[in-house]
């Protein structure tokens, strides 16, 4: 399973996401299926554009997201948005996968 390093971000303004992209980052959102709030993170385009990682984004596989080197979230890739004429990723949507045991 692919492990992606991420940095938690608190501001979600359009100007902030533009700065993230300008500095070589990629904004992303981890959506929760339950009513808990969504998690906004920043990924590195350098990690995302690695040849071994590109095929994961095309297949909608499960990934592990390591946030601030503190905790890991398992998620499924929901949507990947690419720049219109460049080859870089500009936004990713993830869906948080929870493991619930049935009794």
Curated annotation (Swiss-Prot):
GO molecular function terms listed in the Swiss-Prot or TrEMBL record: 5S rRNA binding; structural constituent of ribosome
Name used for this protein in its record: Large ribosomal subunit protein bL25
Its job: This is one of the proteins that binds to the 5S RNA in the ribosome where it forms part of the central protuberance.
SUPFAM superfamilies linked: Ribosomal protein L25-like (SSF50715)
Phylogenetic lineage: Bacteria, Pseudomonadati, Pseudomonadota, Gammaproteobacteria, Enterobacterales
Gene3D superfamilies per the UniProt record, alphabetical: Ribosomal Protein L25, Chain P
Pfam families the UniProt entry points to: Ribosomal_L25p
Organism the protein comes from: Blochmanniella floridana
GO CC annotations, alphabetized: cytosolic large ribosomal subunit
Key words of the record: Ribonucleoprotein, Ribosomal protein, RNA-binding, rRNA-binding
Domain of life assignment: Bacteria
GO annotation, biological process: translation
Family: Belongs to the bacterial ribosomal protein bL25 family.
Subunit comment: Part of the 50S ribosomal subunit; part of the 5S rRNA/L5/L18/L25 subcomplex. Contacts the 5S rRNA. Binds to the 5S rRNA independently of L5 and L18.
